[in-house]
Amino acid sequence: LLGSSLLSSCDDWLNVIPSDQIKEEELFKTGNGFRNALNGVYRQLSMRELYGRNLSWGIIESLGQVYDLTVASDASTKDMKRLLDYKYKDNDVVSVTDAMWEKAWNSIANCNNIIQNVQTKDSTLFYGRNREKNMILGEAIALRAYIHLDLLRLYAPAPSTHPTNVYIPYVDIYPSYISNRKTVEECLSLIIRDLKEAQSIM
């Protein structure tokens, strides 16, 4: 008896949830949870790996050859200098672009999770009823399209170049473990579909 009570209390001790985390089923029980989830997506997008640097003034501008780093360069701009020199397989560049790719897909997954959950909830859960529910849904759909568009412009050529080749997947379900890559035209059609849907909802 003592052994079983020790084991059960040990099991409880091992299953402690950190104070800054919440289970999904708890998060999506309230309108406030949905607001927090959407704010979490915006927060992730503002990180250095995405729009806090790489997709605004960092990597994206280096790819466009906007900077002149020959005058002054330090450790924080090493990856940008490598990109300016077209050294795409350099370890500094690969680690930065891998992190960017991973965070972008994680943000898309979070959007899809919000979309999937908010659609099944009653509007009475939200302060503004349908207006707030639709705003959360519309923003998540629009963000999904926006992130896909940036991934497409980074990892695929212009639509007129190799129109039948596939480049990136378009992920609109959660969870998604394996997704087939699509052509540029297919991705653009899905981006436009999502943007139109988001506009009609909001």
Positions of PLM-derived features:
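Sec-dependent bacterial lipoprotein signal peptides
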Residues: 1-8
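Membrane-proximal, proline-rich intrinsically disordered regions
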Residues: 9-61
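Short clusters of hydrophobic/aromatic residues that line enzyme substrate/ligand-binding pockets
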Residues: 14, 22, 27-28, 86-88, ...
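Solvent-exposed, polar/charged alpha-helical surfaces in well-ordered, non-transmembrane soluble domains
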Residues: 32, 36-39, 43, 109-112, ...
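Conserved, well-structured interaction surfaces
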Residues: 77-155, 177, 182, 197-202
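Alpha-helix N-cap/helix-start motif at coil-to-helix transitions, marked by capping-box chemistry
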Residues: 102-109, 164, 185, 189-192
